[in-house]
Amino acid sequence: MHAKKQFRRRPLVDRECGSMLIELLIAMVVLAIGLGGILVLLVASIYTNNTAGKDTTSTMIAEHVLEQISAQPANAVSSLTLTDCAGTGWSINTVGASQGTGSGGSHGGNGANLTTTGIIDWTESYAAVPANYAMKYTACGAGGKQIVYDIRWDILTMSNYSRMIVVSARPSGSPVVGGVRYIIPPNMRTIGGM
């Protein structure tokens, strides 16, 4: 007789037991970090989209003021009046001065200070800009929303028959430098003559 060998099956021990749970946990952590990063980018992009609209309006308002001033003869001494969306009539002084001899600092004529590169110096406070060379213009927006813009200009007399006009605008309350809320103020210039 043959003795039968009985083989007993040993239960298989699953050495990978629980590894799926660990993989799932790692995947969830990676996903949470990724979604957190995307959320920050999404919020920043929504905010900068709104900022782009304000930036475009700043350019449009600066161009409007520039056109109003340049439409006057270079030797005109009378002020203009510009009415904003709030019904405020702003007086615009168009009298210029030679470089360094007016109220615009050593690089400007009359008006807001200019930097060494010939752009409006936004570090100068609004109150320090001479009267009628700056305004807090209220622009009409969609749905009756109004935004106030800080507009400044400087007029350099080049000769008896010509002058250079520099105009800049930005939303009131925007930071002077850096950050998500920063809007680069457009600086527009033209030569106006007789």
Model-found features: residue ranges?
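Short secondary-structure boundary micro-motifs
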Residues: 7, 13, 32-34, 42-43, ...
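N-terminal leader/signal peptides at the extreme start of proteins
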Residues: 1-19
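General helical secondary-structure elements
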Residues: 4-6, 50, 159, 185
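Low-complexity, Gly/Pro-rich coil/beta segments used as flexible assembly/activation regions
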Residues: 56, 60-194
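Aliphatic-rich helix starts adjacent to a transmembrane/signal segment
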Residues: 19-63
